[in-house]
């Protein structure tokens, strides 16, 4: 399997990396979050820009990013506009979604960009090309907040992401039962054994918490923890998360 190196973080080896989301609505709130995150043992910061009140003004988005980057100069930043259809805060058209992501990827000020799988393929491929030209890694994602698809479907989506050029394919699904969590873990194990790229998977909500902890066993390269406000159901406090990941890593 290929390792994916972003600044001082290597995905695809050792314990799963910890990503903590920033969800501030204003520049002041984002600066406060970034300063707090300086004090936390994390690997990646995800800026959930769909929470940002001035997201439709690209100059203001870049200015806010500059403020975050000043406070967190060495921390990998994952730039994510989560669409409303996949659980995000704001509904926007496809044209704006791609303009926003391509513009910010072109600045060279982000390290990773989230690209949702279920979009027009030509748009997805163009955004991946723009990202890679600017040395930005692509986290290609899919989120199902209603259910856990069949194992074959989860495997198919992750495999498709890699085929399209994702550096880190990602899927998050909602369990209705413990069996659904096992389905996600089984699919993760199957894909990670044959994939060329590290993958990121999780089963959400309380039932799925085990999937956020067991990535090193089943083959998920990153997990999401909460420092202030969780951006998805089931996210664990980042300090508790690090403790458990370290404990499992020592036994592995």
UniProtKB/Swiss-Prot annotation:
EC primary class: lyase
For the keyword Iron, the answer is: no
Q: Give the keywords, sorted.
A: Amino-acid biosynthesis, Aromatic amino acid biosynthesis, Lyase, Schiff base
Which residues are listed for 3-dehydroquinate binding in this entry?
Answer: 46-48, 82, 212, 231, 235
| A single GO molecular function term of this UniProt record | 3-dehydroquinate dehydratase activity
Keyword Ribosomal protein in record: no
Q: Which residues participate directly in catalysis? A: 143, 170
- Catalytic activity, reaction form: 3-dehydroquinate = 3-dehydroshikimate + H2O
Reported EC number(s) for this entry are: 4.2.1.10
Q: Which GO terms describe its biological process?
A: 3,4-dihydroxybenzoate biosynthetic process; amino acid biosynthetic process; aromatic amino acid family biosynthetic process; chorismate biosynthetic process
Task: Give the domain of life.
Answer: Bacteria
* Pathway assigned to this chain's UniProt record: Metabolic intermediate biosynthesis; chorismate biosynthesis; chorismate from D-erythrose 4-phosphate and phosphoenolpyruvate: step 3/7
**Quaternary structure and partners:** Homodimer.
Q: Which HAMAP family match?
A: AroD
The job of this chain, per UniProt, is described as:
Involved in the third step of the chorismate pathway, which leads to the biosynthesis of aromatic amino acids. Catalyzes the cis-dehydration of 3-dehydroquinate (DHQ) and introduces the first double bond of the aromatic ring to yield 3-dehydroshikimate.
Q: Which family does it belong to?
A: Belongs to the type-I 3-dehydroquinase family.
Q: What is this protein called?
A: 3-dehydroquinate dehydratase
Tell me what organism the protein belongs to. Listeria monocytogenes serotype 4b (strain F2365)
């Amino acid at each position: 399997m290929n390792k994916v190196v972003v600044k001082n973080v290597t995905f695809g080896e050792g314990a799963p990396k910890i990503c903590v989301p920033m969800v501030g609505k204003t520049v002041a709130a984002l600066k406060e979050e970034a300063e707090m995150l300086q004090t936390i043992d994390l690997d990646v910061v995800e800026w959930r820009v769909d929470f940002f009140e001035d997201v439709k003004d690209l100059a203001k988005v870049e200015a806010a990013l500059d403020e975050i980057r000043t406070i967190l100069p060495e921390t990998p930043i994952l730039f994510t506009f989560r669409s409303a259809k996949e659980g995000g805060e704001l509904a926007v058209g496809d044209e704006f979604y791609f303009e926003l992501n391509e513009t910010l990827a072109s600045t060279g000020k982000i390290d990773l960009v989230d690209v949702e799988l279920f979009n027009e393929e030509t748009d997805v491929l163009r955004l991946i090309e723009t990202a890679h030209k600017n040395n930005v890694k692509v986290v290609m994602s899919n989120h199902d907040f209603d259910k856990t698809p069949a194992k074959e479907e989860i495997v198919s989506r992750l495999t498709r992401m890699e085929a399209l050029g994702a550096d880190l394919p990602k899927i998050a699904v909602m369990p209705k039962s413990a069996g659904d969590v096992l389905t996600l873990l089984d699919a993760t194990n199957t894909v990670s054994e044959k994939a060329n790229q590290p993958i990121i998977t999780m089963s959400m909500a309380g039932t799925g918490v085990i999937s956020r902890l067991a990535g090193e066993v089943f083959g998920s390269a990153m997990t999401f923890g909460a420092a202030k406000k969780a951006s998805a159901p089931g996210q664990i406090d980042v300090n508790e998360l690090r403790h458990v990941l370290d404990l499992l890593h020592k036994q592995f």
